[in-house]
Amino acid sequence: LSGIPVWSWDNWMKDKDRSGLVPFDLHIHDIDFMVSVFGAPKTVMSRRAGSESQDAVHALYEHDGFFITCDSAWYNCDYPFAASFRFQFEKGVVEYTGGVLHVYEEGGTSRVITPGIEDGEAHENGLGLPSSSGYENEIKYFVHCVLENQPTSRVPEEELKTVLSILRRL
């Protein structure tokens, strides 16, 4: 979820032909993660609502024995970027929202987990994770592949084809 990216050069992010709008700006990350972990879904059901002032996708992806729902949207205001997830398992729910990971266990117990902290020591960002960001690491890897003239090994070609096929149907 995010505000409309009004910061883009020549307003290209709001041009469907150049950017693909919400599916290719935000929803691609949901699908990429889903396909890399669970493989291609058996069925895809989606609803998309778009206008001059917003774009939104709600999708349900069915896999063998479970389903995944995803919501992605641009809002016509200064809405801060937000990423979250919720997984339901046989004996509980794991939810990441607002930078906090919660585990809600069967029987009513719950706890907060701080990813990456070992032996009580956290990095400067408080999460026990390197201070570099996902964006920074992604760009460094891309530059490395270009400079070394190497194909990417992190996203197999078949996964990429699956992700793009799903996106083009939204």
Regions inferred by a protein language model and the residue ranges of each:
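Active-site rim elements
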Residues: 19-22, 125-130, 149-153
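C-terminal helix-rich "cap/oligomerization" subdomain common to oxidoreductases
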Residues: 137-170
